[in-house]
């Protein structure tokens, strides 16, 4: 049963008009490329090249470091300059391979892939794993692992997350409009892994052109359906999307597979098509650069490892000095202290905000208005959870389901007292989860 929406949520200014009509532009890096070994959930990748080695575009430079891991490929040709810790967009230092770009873009000779119709399920999964594909719309969970549930026959829905509900980001929107065929072909490949499953494309109703495009592409596909979802943040959250498209509910202790679902986003499914049908490893992605602080917001096809400062240059550079630069969306993304960091597998956007775009408020006392409760998609009481967090009361925080918070930021967005609810709850949630692992 498709409900097409969920309880709670908010309607922030979406800011998408800045970049939604800008076609995808291929950009080439100028300087060195930096490849962090941790661009995904799980074990870091392990370098298989050394300083001084010459590498080609499409060559594996790091292999998966375990079952839950993913290999990394060079996105340019050049020479390995050094392997050392470098900063990631999140601000942590991670062991990284630095490649000096020779500007030649010599590419490995890919072997002619086997016809998808002739491939076994194991061969399809291996192709996905070997390509280094991870979730490109969230935390970067290795896709081969996600597509390998213990009981595949119990999976009856493959959900393509086409919501792109975060404000400003238009990368998936442009991907669907310009390369929607890759998304549909990728869904066909995934459906070959799950005999009993149906493919659902969940698209918010503020993207009628995407809905029309996907309906046209799937009109002769009986195992696929395009669902027009109500526009509301965080419609693209995994739990909210599953509930809106299937009517099934999951909590933080469950995986989507426990509800018979697998969820992947537009970029990930498109990468699956290119890997399985064309033999191409995961080497680049679409990144939105937006915000009033840049001259020409747009959508760029950027190779992994490219310096994010170069992407901002591709968007015309700064119009004014930005007050804040965010990696990801303004609701769930994070502020960066430098743009001298690489584009990674999970880099969906770079948002450069002016002082006028950034809220500057001093928090005051809670007025018990209940707005945070009304908008919470996890049906929690954020004001109370924030109180527990501020008093370091982990027991009460856990007892009142604080671990169910998805840190969407809806509560902070509507709070008239401007309390930093998301930050307080998120901090305590991380502490509680870390302590749980120690037990």
Regions found by a protein language model. Name each.
Residues 1-48:
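N-terminal, Lys/Arg-enriched amphipathic/low-complexity engagement segments
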Residues 50-63, 82:
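Short, well-structured beta-strand-loop connectors
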Residues 78-80:
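Conserved hydrophobic positions within beta-strands
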Residues 102-127, 132, 137, 150, ...:
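Flanking helices and flexible, charged tails adjoining ferredoxin-like Fe-S electron-transfer domains
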Residues 177-192:
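Histidine-anchored nucleotide/phosphate-binding helix
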Residues 196-308, 314-319, 329:
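Hydrophobic alpha-helical positions that pack around
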Residues 232-236, 240-249, 316-367:
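Active-site gating/interface segments in enzymes
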Residues 347-363, 373, 377-439:
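Ferredoxin-type iron-sulfur electron-transfer modules in oxidoreductases and energy-metabolism complexes
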């Amino acid at each position: 049963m498709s409900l097409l929406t969920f309880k709670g949520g908010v309607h922030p200014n979406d800011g998408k008009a800045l970049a939604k009509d800008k076609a995808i532009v291929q950009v080439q890096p100028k300087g060195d490329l930096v490849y962090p070994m941790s661009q995904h959930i799980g074990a870091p990748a392990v370098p298989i090249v050394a300083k001084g080695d010459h590498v080609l575009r499409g060559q594996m430079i790091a292999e998966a470091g375990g079952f839950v891991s993913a290999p990394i490929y060079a996105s340019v040709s050049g020479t390995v300059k050094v392997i050392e810790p470098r900063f990631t967009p999140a601000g942590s230092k991670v062991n990284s391979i630095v490649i000096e770009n020779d500007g030649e873009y010599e590419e490995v000779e890919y072997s002619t892939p086997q016809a998808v119709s002739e491939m076994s399920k194991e061969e399809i999964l291996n192709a996905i794993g070997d390509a280094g594909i991870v979730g490109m719309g969230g935390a970067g969970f290795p896709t081969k692992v996600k597509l390998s549930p213990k009981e595949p026959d119990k999976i009856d829905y493959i959900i393509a997350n086409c919501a792109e509900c975060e404000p400003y980001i238009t990368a998936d929107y442009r991907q669907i409009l310009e390369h929607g065929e890759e998304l549909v072909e990728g869904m066909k490949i995934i459906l070959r892994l799950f005999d009993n499953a149906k493919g659902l494309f969940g698209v918010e109703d503020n993207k009628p052109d995407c809905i029309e495009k996907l309906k046209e592409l799937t009109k002769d596909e009986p195992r696929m359906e395009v669902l027009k979802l109500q526009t509301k943040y965080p419609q693209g959250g995994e739990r909210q999307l599953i509930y809106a498209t299937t009517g099934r509910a999951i909590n933080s202790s469950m995986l989507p597979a426990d509800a018979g679902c697998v969820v992947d986003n537009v970029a990930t499914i498109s990468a699956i098509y290119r890997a399985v049908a064309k033999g191409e490893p995961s080497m680049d992605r679409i990144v939105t650069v937006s915000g009033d602080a840049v001259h020409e917001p747009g959508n760029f096809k950027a190779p992994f490892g490219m310096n994010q400062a170069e992407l901002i240059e591709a968007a015309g550079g700064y119009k004014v000095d930005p007050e804040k630069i965010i990696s990801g969306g303004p609701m769930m993304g994070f502020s960066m202290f430098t743009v001298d960091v690489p584009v990674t597998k999970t880099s969906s956007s770079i948002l450069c905000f002016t002082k006028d775009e950034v809220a500057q408020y001093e928090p005051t006392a809670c007025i018990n208005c209940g707005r945070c409760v009304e908008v919470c998609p996890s049906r929690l009481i954020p004001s109370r959870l924030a109180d527990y967090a501020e008093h370091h009361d982990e027991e009460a925080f856990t007892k009142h389901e604080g671990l169910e918070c998805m840190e969407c930021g809806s509560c902070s967005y509507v709070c008239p007292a401007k309390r930093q609810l998301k930050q307080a709850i998120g901090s305590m949630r991380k502490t509680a989860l870390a302590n749980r692992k120690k037990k």
